[in-house]
Structures are given as C-alpha cells and as structure tokens.
Amino acid sequence: MQKDDVAGRITAVAEQVLTPQGLELVEVEYKREGRQMVLRLFVDKPGGISLDDCAAVSRELSEILDVEDFIRENYTLEVSSPGLNRPLKKEADYERYAGRLVKVRTFELLADEEGNRRKTFLGDLVGLSDGVVTLTLREGQLARIPLDKIAKANLEFEF
C-alpha cells in the first residue's frame, strides 16, 4: 500500500477513535525514518492535549490497526501533541486561531498591500474569508494570501 493510501486509511480510522473523545486529528505522517517506517499522528483538543490522552489514543488505535492489518510494513506508532507551533491545516483553523501570531509560507512570491513580494509572512491572523487568509504583518500592513497558495502555515509562539 502506498504512503498516501496508508495516510488516508489511517485518517478515517483515527477520526472514529478521536471524535467520540472530543479530540481532533491535526495531521498524519507516514514516512521512513532511517530503516523504520513511522506512523505519527498529531492530535489536539480545546485547552490542549495531555500525555494521558496521547497514551489512550495510542492504545486504542494500536488495537484497531492490529485487527485491520492493512499496513504491510513494520512501523512505529507515535501519537503526539502538535506542539506550540501547531500547523494550520483546515479552513476552520484559520478562524479558530484569529488574533494569534502565525507564520505562513507560500509556494510562490506574493505581494503584501504595499507591493513587497515575499514567500514568508509573519503576522497576526485576521481570519479567512472567501478562500483568502488575511494577516496583519509585523510591519503593520495587511497581506491577503489565497489558501491554495499556502505551502505551510503554523502558529508562532512568542516568548
């Protein structure tokens, strides 16, 4: 089974485990690290996820994966918090984290409202409207970034 197929099936199985517990699947990674395949799930919930939450999800998911047995290679299962620099993956993330500091990287050079072209934008997330993410940049100007131009977006933690 291809990596993308595994990630897709894992997403479906994980959602069945997480949703009843009030947990959210943020991201699934299935990749080779050294000689070993690693299946890594990042999960979250309002107020943050605990180590006990991760352990419970790992146990339950491991049992289901052992029964379904659709991953043919040996792998290590890891369940983790998305961390302080949580990725923004879903449209709802751009609404939920409005007002927070984010870093957005785009696939191509884009201009802010003053015409400065860049691929990395750092600013306070205003929100998402009609498929466009709006940030108030650290320099004060606005940047409007089409969602389909975003390569990666993360919350940024300020010390």
UniProtKB/Swiss-Prot annotation:
Its main location: cytoplasm. Coiled coil: none annotated. It is found in: Cytoplasm. GO terms for biological process: ribosomal small subunit assembly; translation. Pfam families: DUF150_C, RimP_N. GO terms for cellular component: cytosol. The keyword Protein biosynthesis does not apply. It comes from the Bacteria. InterPro entries: Ribosome_maturation_RimP, RimP_C, RimP_C_sf, RimP_N, RimP_N_sf. Keywords: Cytoplasm, Ribosome biogenesis. Required for maturation of 30S ribosomal subunits. PANTHER family: RIBOSOME MATURATION FACTOR RIMP (PTHR33867:SF1). NCBIfam families: PRK14647.1 (NF011241). Belongs to the RimP family. This is Ribosome maturation factor RimP. The lineage of its organism: Bacteria, Pseudomonadati, Thermodesulfobacteriota, Desulfuromonadia, Geobacterales.
